[in-house]
Amino acid sequence: MQSKRPPKAHVKTMLSAKNLEDNEGSNESAAKIPCESPISEARRLNNLKLSKYYPRGSVLFVEGQRPRGVHVLCEGRAKVSIASAQGKTLILRIAQPGDLLGMNATLTGEPYGATVETLERCRIDFIAREDVLKLLDRDKRACLGVAQALSRKLSAVVEHTRLLFLSQSASEKLARLLVRWCDERGKRTALGIRINSDLTHEEMAQMICASRETVTRVLGEFKRKDIVSLSDKAIFVRNRKALESLACC
């Protein structure tokens, strides 16, 4: 039987991932900093993990690759995406500190189902697959933590599916996305609810199955209606009620 080939859009990315494996060295200072995650309290974890810092744009693993283990995101953010053979990309979510990246594939032995790329400098704890399986077999607390993390991930997938397929327009999709970001990581300021985001309009479009031009246009409409204001690294939601009305919340 012919082996599954990764999408063409990821061939170059796979080479980048291999280069990272070959060239990135262990960072001793990273290993000394505590990392909060669903398995952080597990016994003997410090003896199993390999801690590294990765710069922005680093590919941790690629859709279709055989699983080597779990990447625990300790600091920073990363985008989790899938791609078609034609090169169309869909960003499934933005991973946050504490997320277990690649856990599904590590547990099942099936290829990674998505590609993960860092959005900023990240600190990552890597645990090899065989060590993860042994750890979960011996530590009930770690096993429960992973089960809860996977349950939260499933809930997030359901919510993102709702955003993509039950929204009637690009305006509604983008409004839903911004409302969700307000809840997940928004901070109240004098200018409104601040959402830190260094995603490009192209990347935001890849989260809602729209074009870059559409996202730019819709954000412009929101700005003209004084629903949001924009800066280089943040979106300020000035009128949440109006945004929720557009999102049909």
What are these regions (language model features)?
Residues Q2-V59, L100, A105-L107:
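Cyclic nucleotide-binding regulatory module and flanking cytosolic helices
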Residues A42, N47, R93-S155, E159:
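Cyclic-nucleotide recognition modules
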Residues A42, Y53, S58-R121:
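Cyclic nucleotide-binding regulatory domains
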Residues K49, P67-R68, I195:
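Short loop/turn microsegments at loop-to-beta-strand junctions
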Residues R56, Q96-P97, A128, L150, ...:
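A secondary-structure boundary/capping signal
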Residues V70, I94, F126, D198, ...:
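Short aromatic/basic micro-patch
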Residues R141-M207:
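Polybasic "coupling" helices that flank or enter modular domains
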Residues L177, W181-C249:
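Phosphate-/nucleic-acid-contacting segments
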